Amino acid sequence: MKITRLTTYHAAPRWLFLKVETDEGITGWGEPVIEGRARSVEAAVHELAGYVVGKDPARINDLWQTLYRAGFYRGGAILMSAIAGIDQALWDIKGKTLGVPVYELLGGLVRDRMKTYRWVGGDRPGAIIQQITDYRALGFDTFKFNGTEEMKLIDSARAVDAAVVKVAEIREAFGNSIDFGIDFHGRVGAPMAKALLRELEPFKPLFVEEPVLAEQAEYYPRLAASTSIPLAAGERMFSRFEFKNVLCAGGIGMVQPDLSHAGGITECVKIAAMAEAYDVGFAPHCPLGPIALAACLHVDFVSHNAVLQEQSIGIHYNEGADLLDYVINKDDFHCVDGSIAALPKPGLGVEIDEEMLKRTNENPPDWRNPVWRHSDGSIAEW
């Protein structure tokens, strides 16, 4: 079997899908994307195509290493996301060729169901309590929301209090019947993170995500020493080599690599295993589309330290399409009491409606990240 062609499709609201075809008619799907930089990743995918067209798709490890090493320069968001989507598609092809789900190729299940959580509240959170109430009725008991709006490097007591009041209201409304993670989203600088963690600790959040940006990772152990709240990070780390440094330094209780950013299944299986050696949980970042979610689930189902899975049904970014709109076999992704069962079909186990993708690409979406500014006019972290 040889790879014959790579085709990319833009998908609303902000996704990029990749179809990898072979000379035997078996196709694989991947999701290589950086939110807001889909066209850059698309260009990288097609530039990398020369390394894989004409090659045997079964040699996943060799192709991955070639894509990573052959260009001399390596790593970074764009290249690793391009590799991630190609890698996902190769695993999809291999599973379909052998007639088994990808998790069987990775050693088999360590669990029958994977716990997921729901996003509530957006960048400017509104009726979070009502959203939680609605999702509780569907069986979900674990949620995540943004902890702050834009925050200055040194900000006021009012800014801290605004974040605390929101969390206090949620805990008061639901008691300990729910769990929630709080996403600082890289908006909080190191000087304010310690104060926020101290004030939020009485409300027992399940975790705080990106307490500071990845480039300030040296603060993770210092912040962890100041709080009992587990700290989570990893959506803006792109290889096991970046996670190696964070794990060795300590401080993180949960790693969150993104299967569409951090080199795909091949790389993230290794990251999960590294984290397990440090007694650190694995909770893949995935506010993306169905192919990315499927890839995450296969790694979750073979990783003993997988604790939670993010998924984007109903997330505030999903304008124009929701998570399963491009999926034919929607029932396989059905959540029961907030958990998803192991996907039963061969490969990644997601069947994509290519005709719908083609219609979407007649007028392809071009999503961009919001640009925020502080009151003084300076750029703010979104």
From Swiss-Prot:
EC annotation? Answer: 4.2.1.6
**Which keywords fit this entry according to its UniProt record?**
Lyase, Magnesium, Metal-binding
Q: How is the cofactor bound?
A: Binds 1 Mg(2+) ion per subunit.
Co-factor requirement: Mg(2+)
Q: Where is this region: Disordered?
A: 361-382
Pfam families found in the cross-reference section: MR_MLE_C, MR_MLE_N
Q: Where is this site: Increases basicity of active site His?
A: 258
Q: List the CDD domains hit by this protein, alphabetically.
A: D-galactonate_dehydratase
Keyword check for Ribonucleoprotein? no
> What does UniProt list as catalytic?
185 (proton donor), 285 (proton acceptor)
Record GO biological process: amino acid catabolic process; D-galactonate catabolic process
Detail which positions bind Mg(2+). 183, 209, 235
Q: What pathway does the UniProt record associate with this protein?
A: Carbohydrate acid metabolism; D-galactonate degradation; D-glyceraldehyde 3-phosphate and pyruvate from D-galactonate: step 1/3
Which residue numbers mark the site Transition state stabilizer?
Answer: 310
PROSITE patterns recorded = MR_MLE_1, MR_MLE_2
GO-annotated molecular function: galactonate dehydratase activity; magnesium ion binding
Entry function = Catalyzes the dehydration of D-galactonate to 2-keto-3-deoxy-D-galactonate.
- Note on file? Reaction proceeds via an anti dehydration.
Please give the family membership noted in the entry: Belongs to the mandelate racemase/muconate lactonizing enzyme family. GalD subfamily.
For this entry, the protein name equals D-galactonate dehydratase
Q: Which source organism does the UniProt entry give?
A: Xanthomonas euvesicatoria pv. vesicatoria (strain 85-10) (Xanthomonas campestris pv. vesicatoria)
Its gene is dgoD
